[in-house]
Design a protein with these regions (language model features):
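Surface-exposed, low-complexity loop segments enriched in small/polar and acidic residues
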Residues: 227-240, 264-295, 301, 310-522, ...
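N-terminal periplasmic accessory domains that precede
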Residues: 80-83, 87, 107-110, 140-142, ...
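N-terminal Sec signal peptide and the immediately downstream disordered periplasmic leader
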Residues: 1-77, 82-86, 203, 207, ...
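C-terminal beta-signal and adjacent terminal beta-strands/loops
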Residues: 656-658, 743, 791-802, 824-876
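Short acidic/polar hinge/loop motifs at secondary-structure boundaries
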Residues: 127-156
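Extracytoplasmic beta-strand/coil segments of soluble accessory domains associated
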Residues: 81-127
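Short loop/turn motifs that connect adjacent beta-strands in outer-membrane beta-barrel proteins
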Residues: 39-41, 179-182, 195, 211-212, ...
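C-terminal beta-signal and terminal closure region of outer-membrane beta-barrel proteins
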Residues: 415-418, 422-425, 582, 599, ...
Length: 876
């Protein structure tokens, strides 16, 4: 079936669903609607995200969506990730408050499901520092104060020619308040329908405009409480599938210990006395795991300008963010790395007799235990992020504008993991007959205390950017004036990760990990042109060409160029066609280049040896080169003159990424780099050069398995946006429909085998619904407004059941619709009350075979259920 047929089918299905359920979508409008409103007020030249050329028309060859502050407030969001992750163009694995296992308290945006490191985040058009824990490689959205946001522009197109690395899936440009006069105070609180996950926020903004400039100061404090998996029916226990259906399962590493004897004994020590192990002895690890994670956050920000002369202005921006976040998981499961010999006292040994008669004297046993005596595993992060921008901008007599700026960012983090146990030391104590593992009291109090430790890791990153830019009109052509922009940037990035000392020495439970430390710098220069080709011809009212090229020279891999071409064709006043072709790239990050090494033993099969394990060292790879992308977009913008306030945009995108940075199967490296006789082959390839493969006289193969440029990802689809503003019943109305249709999403492994994710939900990689749509409707009176919103997510098949759905109890999930309502009322000219309810119908997330966490997918679905929020604002 053709792509167009699939698209038409998906559109029909989505619109029928919306009509049947009165669905609504997010408050996202295309650039055309915003442009019409702006033109009604005044005509000015502005730089739209995706171009550095200032222009009067917001519609360019690339699709840009705009989210304004009112839409953010209406959603009840206290962090911008709450809004961005609900966009239909967002997808994949999006880290948020509902991700307990491995989130590190971070919040990311993931356009097109291509990964947060392929979405560039800007603040006021300038690169934001990568932030979070470790040697972070993407932006933690917690660092951007939502109360300071004026609007967010989302470019859904590649833009490396304009902005450089990372702009493959698109660009999120957060525009902060700059011209603000007066004082504003906001207080907001919210809570779930279950009485948990409470969240409170207080912020103030004050600003003043004076003769030569202005200054704006903002502070925001947010505190979010937790919710437990034990407090929701769908997540109160880990669900397993049996012949008779679903049942509550659990871990065989149980409370009181689990013993497997060499002669078939299977014992549980739950309750303090050993007995035959049954399913009732399995440990419910959901009961002590967070469903939604707690956090505290402080954001301070400032922006100011000062006129140095009639044509030169000094500007500055400063942001500081401090985050305290926590996650909680079940007590640690531990096990013996080598079997223990049972030596009971009754047979002249030194161990308890409690295992008799199930285990014989001298019998080898394996042991596992859930360490409930020590408490849950508590993950905590403290993250400090600073961003400072200073610069000057001006205008020449000919109207050309220029600016010079310095952008400094710094991120530091400390993350801890409490209530861990050093099983290596416990094993040593058992062998020395100093610790009886079968005696329950050995695992309690002072006896176990010497083996309990807290892991403490540190990490951080630093960013320095010096930039110069120039833009203006260069020549009048028959069809209009040619505009240009040019600039130079120098950027240096560094990052580090210092693991806990026990981990670094290989004395902890996890494999030894070396520290990460490194840096790189890059010199970049770019030129951009906006060339009017044709004007004032029937059916060719205006045709414009845009072109951009960027040269970059990295200290790590060398130099190259990236480019972009775009065309806009205004057929007549109502209709504009647009398209673009570009290349984009993502340079390897510090952690990918210089990530600390860690040894492991991997299973391999190779004709040069009888050994089945290879000594493999994983980590970064300093020989990495950039990921490369080819991007095509085609679209139309239609604003019919016979329907005032109506605007439609339809855009097609196709993104092909090659040279993707990914891990490689160890068998693949061994077979690519050694022949059947153990001789090195393919030594000229990047893969084998980086592997440093060797085989010794015993047949032991050893090599480095660092990250490689060996993968490929392709995705394509359609974005449809319909916006309508009108008057009726004495009210002002605004309606919006935002739809994304996924046509393809494929990833290719090192052998060129394609893995198709379209229409599938995975166990942590992401969810790739074929059809997603958001709708919203706002009615506004003189002193009030009310908004209805809804999100539709198409049904998906479980990726775990792809080969044989009949083997799965829940091989798919049904489509789901979330309904939200909000309203505000102006009590006086200075006081406003607002509030709302998200997930009004209290929809539960779906269960599916092969789920990620909480028996569902917290990256995609709302796990809290119905949520209430209220807000009071004072402004004067």
């Amino acid at each position: 079936m053709s792509s167009l047929s699939l698209t038409a089918k998906a559109i029909r299905r989505g619109f029928l669903t919306i009509a049947a359920t009165t669905v609504a979508t997010g408050s996202v409008f295309s650039g055309s609607v915003i442009a019409e409103e702006a033109q009604a007020e005044k005509v000015e030249r502005i730089a739209v995200t995706g171009s550095r050329i200032k222009r009067t028309d917001m519609e360019t060859a690339s699709p840009v969506s705009v989210i304004d502050a009112s839409a953010i407030i209406a959603s009840g969001a206290t962090s911008i990730d709450d809004v961005l992750q609900k966009m239909t163009s967002s997808g994949g694995a999006m880290t948020n408050a509902a991700v307990n296992n491995g989130s590190g308290g971070n919040a990311r945006v993931n356009l097109r499901g291509l990964g947060s490191n392929r979405t560039l985040v800007l603040v006021n058009g300038r690169r934001m520092i990568a932030s979070g824990t470790g040697a972070a490689s993407s932006v933690d959205l917690n660092t951007i104060p939502v109360s300071m946001i004026q609007r967010v522009e989302v470019l859904k197109d590649g833009a490396s020619a304009v902005y450089g690395t990372d702009a493959i899936a698109g660009v999120v440009n957060v525009i902060l308040k700059r011209d603000f006069d007066g004082f504003e105070l906001n207080v907001q609180t919210g809570i779930s329908g279950q009485g948990d996950a409470d969240e409170s926020s207080i912020d103030f903004t004050m600003g003043n405009t004076f003769d030569k400039g202005n200054v704006v100061i903002n502070a925001q404090y947010t505190k979010r409480g937790d919710a437990s998996q034990a407090d929701r029916d769908f997540s109160e226990c880990p669900i397993a599938e049996g012949a008779d259906g679903l049942y509550c399962a659990g871990s065989s590493y149980s409370e009181g210990g689990h013993i497997w004897g060499a002669n078939g004994a299977d014992l549980s020590g739950r309750g303090g006395e050993y007995h035959e192990f049954t399913d009732a002895d399995r440990y419910n690890y959901s009961a002590s795991s967070f469903l939604s994670t707690p956090m505290e956050r402080l954001n301070l920000s400032m922006a100011g300008t000062y006129d140095l002369s009639d044509s030169i202005m000094f500007f500055s921006e400063a942001m500081y963010s401090k985050r305290w976040s926590d996650q909680q998981m079940a007590p640690q499961p531990i096990w013996n790395s080598e079997s223990w010999e049972y030596q009971p006292i009754s047979a002249g040994g030194w161990m308890t007799d409690d295992l008799l008669p199930w285990v014989e004297d001298g019998e080898l046993v394996d042991y596992g235990r859930r360490m409930v005596e020590s408490g849950s595993r508590d993950f905590s992060q403290v993250v400090d992020t600073i961003r400072l921008v200073v610069g000057v901008e001006g205008e020449f007599d000919n109207g050309w504008t220029w600016d010079a700026s310095y952008n400094k960012g710094k991120n530091d983090s400390v993350d801890t993991l409490a209530n861990l146990h050093n099983i290596g030391s416990i094993n040593d104590a058992v062998q020395a007959e100093e610790f009886d593992p079968f005696l329950q009291s050995s695992w309690m109090g002072d006896s176990i205390a010497p083996f309990v430790y807290t892991e403490v890791n540190a990490g951080g990153s630093e960013l320095d950017i010096a930039s110069l830019s120039l833009s203006g009109d260069i020549v009048d052509l028959p069809a209009g004036t040619m505009g240009f922009a040019a600039g130079y940037e120098f950027r240096k990035e560094s990052a580090y990760y210092t693991p806990d000392s026990l981990t670094a020495q290989g004395l902890a439970n996890d494999p030894r990990v070396e520290a990460t430390s490194g840096s790189f710098d890059v010199n970049e220069a770019y030129v951009e042109l906006a060339i009017p080709l044709i004007s004032d011809i029937p059916l060719l009212q205006q045709v414009d060409l845009s072109a951009a090229i960027r040269y970059f020279d990295y200290s790590t891999f060398g130099d190259d160029t990236t480019w972009k071409l775009g065309l806009t064709w205004r057929v007549f006043d109502d209709l504009m066609l647009r398209g673009g072709q570009s290349t984009a790239f993502r340079a390897p990050t510090v952690s990918e280049l210089f990530g600390g090494k860690s040894p492991s033993f991997d299973q391999i099969v190779h004709p040069a040896t009888d050994q089945t394990q290879a000594e493999v060292t994983v980590g970064g790879n300093p020989l990495l080169t950039p990921e490369e992308a080819d991007i095509t977009t085609l679209g139309l913008v239609y604003s019919p003159s016979f329907v005032d306030g109506l605007s439609l945009t339809v855009d097609y995108y196709d993104i092909g990424i090659t040279n993707t940075i990914t891990s490689v199967d160890s068998n693949y490296i061994a077979n690519q780099c050694l022949d059947a006789n153990g001789n090195k082959i393919n030594e000229g390839t990047a893969l084998c050069q980086a592997s440093n493969i060797e085989i010794d006289n015993t047949g032991r193969i050893s090599f480095d398995n660092g990250l490689q440029n060996i993968g490929e990802t392709n995705t394509s689809g359609f974005d449809i946006n319909l916006a309508y503003t009108f008057e009726g019943l004495g009210l002002d109305w605004k309606a919006g429909l935002d739809t994304s249709i996924l046509d393809t999403y494929e990833e290719f492994d090192q052998d060129g085998n394609a893995v198709d994710y379209k229409g599938f939900i995975t166990g942590g990689v992401g969810a790739y619904a074929e059809f997603k749509t958001n709708f919203n409707l706002t009615a506004a009176g003189d002193d009030w407004s009310a908004t209805y919103e809804a999100r539709y997510i198409d049904g998906m098949d479980s990726f775990a059941c792809k080969d044989d759905p009949s083997d799965c109890y829940a091989p798919s999930v049904d489509s789901i619709v979330y309904h939200d309502i909000s309203a505000n009322y102006d009590i006086t000219e200075t006081v406003r009350l607002s509030g709302g309810v998200n997930n009004v119908l209290d929809e539960e997330p779906p269960y599916y075979t092969g789920n990620n966490d909480s028996n569902t997918d917290p990256y995609t679905y709302d796990v809290l259920g119905r949520y209430f929020f209220v807000r009071a604002s004072v402004k004067f």
